[in-house]
Amino acid sequence: MRSHMDDRFIEDFKSFAQAEALRDPDLETPLGQLIEGLGSVDSVNPEPGPTLPVVRDHLGAALDAASGAAGSLLRGVVSGLSWVQPYLEHAGEPDMDALRAGYAYAPIVGALDGGLSPLWFSDAVFAGAVLQGPDVVYPSHVHKAAELYWVASGTARWQKGDEWSIHGPGTLIFHD
């Protein structure tokens, strides 16, 4: 169960996004959409879900290494998160099985869709935490949703088109 103090997360997240928009004016529009969406959320107080092996094996070290505002924000809510391994529909496909074994995500803000409940409800925005274990490769993909990723710890190797880039803690990545 979250305490009332944890509700500061939304205000802190909005302040963080506002600072990022000032730092990188090219991302003013998607960050503005995030800030606007965070302005109309409702606290949910869900029961924590079961843990997963990747979370048990890697979350502690990832949090210990997390730095900057993204790390602070994550540490403030992590105890209430419920984690899930995605892409059950791809079970039996070797590359997706390898991904799922070392990857989990947890909704923080989002819709109440009958699956795992986020900590705050919003029908306008989804924000969550992603935990990707060492040497896990997330396959190339294309989708309609624009995504903002903040690297809290570790190193993210990111591909956009044919170009690869490497991002460390504190980096904001816009995936569109």
Residue map of PLM features:
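A short, N-terminal "cap"/entry segment at the start of jelly-roll beta-barrel domains
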Residues: S3, D7-S122
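Short acidic-glycine-tyrosine-enriched beta hairpin
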Residues: A124, L148-W150, G161-D176
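Short beta-strand segments in beta-sandwich/barrel cores
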Residues: V137-Y138, E147, G154-Q159
